[in-house]
From Swiss-Prot:
GO terms for molecular function: protein-containing complex binding. One of its GO terms (biological process) is killing of cells of another organism. This is Complement component C8 beta chain. It comes from Homo sapiens. Belongs to the complement C6/C7/C8/C9 family. The gene is C8B.
């Protein structure tokens, strides 16, 4: 199948370096927010007035999508009575190249005399459609314990234990979903958080009565606290990128069998509107004489913890895993990760994050006799007192007039020759487009923060998580041959990580960011650049930062160690651009 025009998979792209500074993709609290529209037209208009767009001397050659040859057919699976084969993505399409338009796996019926031993003995009631095994005491109790209502069928009488309506915990649906950590996107449900095992004790939070799911060990409300911003100054884009974005990047590189110790902050998919907006607005200041003031306020409203064992899996995930072939076939296991993610959440912090970045023109600041410390002081105290108490500003070593000048420039930043070049805002939690709209108009006020905090309380985002690989949900309680399936999932996860990486994309021009969407690569261009490869720009001889190529395969195990390498040549640094950050080689223990 080499050189074919095929492939239509839904796997998201490995998250690029900006992920975690951006918020939670497709989370409760992010729906309805469209920050990509705020201010972008004005920014582009100002460029059009002051600069003439020109094309870089680059000839774009369409790159066609290319798949590997088919793998060999597996033997006939005795339980599914099917056999399988698959193909890998070798080269994504790019620059209007020919796409891959058909499936990257094939399944066909077959006949075998081998017996199927895939059934796990059930001592209770076997649900008719979902195949779930539930305790007989849960029959006819008014709850859909099976997920298909078969436990409530043919009942002479319903003995309903819960007499009062109770709400579901905030964000509980996303907490039950699998998460693709290569994209920070939530996928299909892997846990059933609508299963209660007959439990009906109410849990009160803010006078609201909640029903605790069987799988949940604890869901603890947190005090809102004060709306305070932590402000930090960065004298260059490279400092800003390293300290704000790269430190909160996705977990795209794994050791320890894809296990990640501790709790970490979630990011956002580069495919989301907010992710693209953030890249376009901040990347254009790379290799400019701009300085950055980054401010952030965190709000925690609840802590969530999953039970450590005996979990009730969602019936859709249960059935999909049961249909996996025991003989390894990457295509079937790859589809499981596409549909249900790579990991599941064991602990989480729910709440919101309000952050903004002021981008200042260093030369204009010097002409106006401003320092970044002045901007810091004015921004911080404008939030606290609304710019009303002159003595506070004087005590900070900056005049009232100077502070008012800065704050007015923030509102008028789309005009030419201003000291404030941009205000980039990211609001997570609250699901309020109104708040996001206001956030782009001026620095946050106490009233705006109170409005946002009230919205976060009832519609929080998942901002931090602790996770386990999806294969940890495959236990002998639910699956025969669980050890075989787990080992297959581990192997497939390593292959999946390599296949969905944007390192397969050709470089974008002008520090554009390549993003792999299924089997197609796109370039996200900084504001001021456009074209399929960001090749049309107002800037000449732009410094190009280096980007890593794909990792090599792991070496064979020698001396209980194995290694792999990668090269900084996709593209290499050019015109004084920055080198790649991170290691060029990795070493792991092996046996």
């Amino acid at each position: 199948m080499k050189n074919s025009r095929t492939w239509a998979w839904r796997a998201p792209v490995e998250l690029f370096l900006l992920c975690a500074a951006l918020g939670c993709l497709s989370l409760p609290g992010s729906r309805g927010e469209r920050p990509h529209s705020f201010g972008s037209n004005a920014v582009n208009k100002s460029f059009a007035k002051s600069r003439q767009m020109r094309s870089v001397d680059v000839t774009l050659m369409p790159i066609d999508c290319e798949l590997s040859s088919w793998s060999s057919w597996t033997t006939c699976d005795p339980c599914q009575k099917k056999r399988y084969r698959y193909a890998y993505l070798l080269q994504p399409s790019q620059f209007h190249g020919e796409p891959c338009n058909f499936s990257d796996k094939e399944v066909e019926d077959c006949v075998t005399n081998r017996p199927c031993g895939s059934q796990v003995r059930c001592e209770g009631f076997v649900c008719a459609q979902t195949g779930r095994c539930v305790n007989r005491r849960l029959l006819c109790n008014g709850d859909n314990d099976c997920g298909d209502q078969s436990d409530e069928a043919n009942c002479r009488r319903i003995y309903k234990k819960c007499q009062h309506e109770m709400d579901q915990y905030w964000g509980i649906g996303s907490l039950a979903s699998g998460i693709n950590l290569f994209t920070n996107s939530f996928e299909g449900p892997v846990l059933d958080h609508r299963y209660y095992a007959g439990g009906c004790s109410p849990h009160y939070i803010l006078n609201t009565r909640f029903r605790k799911p069987y799988n949940v060990e604890s869901y603890t409300p947190q005090t809102q606290g004060k709306y305070e911003f932590i402000l930090k100054e960065y004298e260059s884009y490279s400092d800003f990128e390293r300290n704000v974005t790269e430190k909160m990047a996705s977990k795209s590189g794994f050791s320890f069998g894809f296990k990640i110790p501790g709790i970490f902050e979630l990011g956002i998919s580069s495919q989301s509107d907010r992710g693209k907006h953030y890249i376009r607005r901040t990347k254009r200041f790379s290799h400019t004489k701009s300085v950055f003031l980054h401010a952030r306020s965190d709000l925690e409203v609840a802590h969530y913890k999953l039970k450590p064992r005996s979990l009730m899996l969602h019936y859709e995930f249960l059935q999909r895993v049961k249909r996996l072939p025991l003989e390894y076939s990457y295509g079937e296991y790859r589809d499981l990760f596409r549909d249900f993610g790579t990991h599941y959440i064991t602990e989480a912090v729910l709440g919101g994050i309000y952050e903004y970045t002021l981008v200042m023109n260093k030369e204009a600041m010097e002409r106006g006799d401003y320092t970044l410390n002045n901007v810091h002081a004015c921004a911080k105290n404008d939030f606290k007192i609304g710019g009303a108490i002159e003595e506070v500003y004087v005590s900070l070593g900056v005049s009232v007039g100077k502070c008012r000048g800065i704050l007015n420039e923030i509102k008028d930043r789309n005009k030419r020759d201003t000291m404030v070049e941009d205000l980039v805002v990211l609001v997570r939690g609250g699901a309020s487009e109104h708040i996001t709209t206001l956030a782009y108009q001026e620095l946050p006020t106490a009233d705006l923060m109170q409005e946002w905090g009230d919205a976060v309380q009832y519609n929080p985002a998942i901002i931090k998580v602790k996770v386990e690989p999806l294969y940890e949900l495959v236990t002998a309680t639910d699956f025969a041959y669980s050890s075989t399936v787990r080992q297959n999932m581990k192997q497939a996860l390593e292959e999946f990580q390599k296949e969905v990486s944007s390192c397969h994309c050709a470089p974008c021009q002008g520090n554009g960011v390549p993003v792999l969407k299924g089997s197609r690569c796109d370039c996200i261009c900084p504001v001021g650049s456009q074209g399929l490869a960001c090749e049309v720009s107002y800037r000449k001889n732009t410094p190009i930062d280096g980007k890593w190529n794909c990792w090599s395969n792991w070496s064979s195990c020698s001396g209980r160690r194995k290694t792999r390498q990668r090269q900084c040549n996709n593209p290499p640094p050019q015109n004084g651009g920055s080198p790649c950050s991170g290691p060029a080689s990795e070493t792991l223990d092996c046996s």
